[in-house]
Amino acid sequence: MRTKEKHGIPISILCTLSGRSRQAYYKQLHHKEKSQVEGELIIQQVMDYRKVQKRLGTCKLLWLMAPFLKQQEIAIGRDSMFTLLRLNGLLVGKVKSNKPRTTDSNHWMKKHPNLIQNLTPVMAGGLWVSDITYINLSQGHSFLSLVTDAYSRKIVGFHLSEHLTAAGPVKALEMAIGACGDTEGLIHHSDRGSQYCCNDYVGILQENKISISMTQSGDPRDNAIAERVNGILKSELLEDVYTDVRAAGICVARAVETYNYLRPHTSLDMLTPALAHSKVNQLKHHWTSPYQRKLKREASMKGNQT
C-alpha cells in the first residue's frame, strides 16, 4: 500500500490538509493515472493515422478512432481532443508557399457559359469539376490536373505534369472518361483557362457528348468543389516540397488513393468519396451549391447597404 507521496509527506497528513478521505485520494490518483494512459493510447493512434494522412484534422481523427475509443472504453470530446493534440504539438498548422498563377483566361478561344449555377447533382457521373494546382519542387513547380465528381467528391482523373500546358488536363480527362465508360448527360465544369478552352480539350468533351460549362468570373468560389479538393490534397496528404516531378508523381498517386478510399468527408456525412460514389439520392450533403452561396452573399451585401 502506498503510504507516502514522492516528496516524503505522509498521505494521512495530505488527506487531513485537503479535507479528503484516503479512499477519495486514491480514487483521484487512479483517475489521473487512467487519464494519462488513455492519453498515451490516443496519441499513439493519432500518430498511426498521421503516417498516411499527415495533416488529418481533429474532427476526422475522432470519427476514424471511434471504434477504437469504444473498444477501449475511452470517452473524449472534440475540445478535449483538441487540447490533447495541442499539448503534444500535434495540431495542424497552415501551409504557406509561393503560389504561381495556374489560370490564364486572357485568350482568344471560346469561353463557354456556366451551366451549373442552380444545379445540385443527385448521383455520380452527372457533373465533373476540373482544375489545375501547383506542387512545389526543389527547383520550380509541377502542375497537378484533377477531375473530380461533384456528387461524390471522388477524384476520377489526375495527371502531374512538368509544364502548365493542356497536355496534363487532357490526360486527366482521358483517365476520367476511361474509368467512367458512359458519359451520357454528363456536364464538365472548369475555369476559363486556356488549357480548358483549347481545341484538344474541348474536342475530347464534344467527341464524348459531354456538355461544357465554365465559370464566368475569376472568383475561385465559382469552382469551389475543385478548389476544395486541391486544398485537401495539398494541406493534408502531400508534402510542402518534393525533390523532382518523379518523386512528386509517386506521392500524388498515393495521396489520391488515400483521399478516395480512406479520408471521410464532413460534407458527405463522413463517408469516403469511394463509398459515396456508389450511392444515388442517399447522401446527406452538408453543403450548398456555389450558386446558392453566391446568392446568399449578394443578399447579405444588399442587406448591409440598406
Regions found by a protein language model. Name each.
Residues 1-14, 18:
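Double-stranded DNA-binding cores of transcription factors and transposases
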Residues 75-146, 168-172, 179-186, 289, ...:
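Mobile-element integrase/transposase regions
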Residues 8-9, 56, 243:
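Residue-level signal for the short linker/turn that defines the boundary of a DNA-recognition helix
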Residues 206-210, 232-306:
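C-terminal domain-tail junction helix/linker
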Residues 149-150, 160-165:
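A short acidic/small-residue loop/turn micro-motif
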Residues 14-15, 25, 46, 61, ...:
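Mobile genetic element proteins and their domesticated derivatives, centered on retroelements
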Residues 102-105, 190-192, 198-201, 212-234, ...:
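RNase H-like two-metal-ion nuclease catalytic core shared by retroviral integrases
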Residues 15, 22-123, 274-281:
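Basic, flexible linker segments flanking DNA-binding modules
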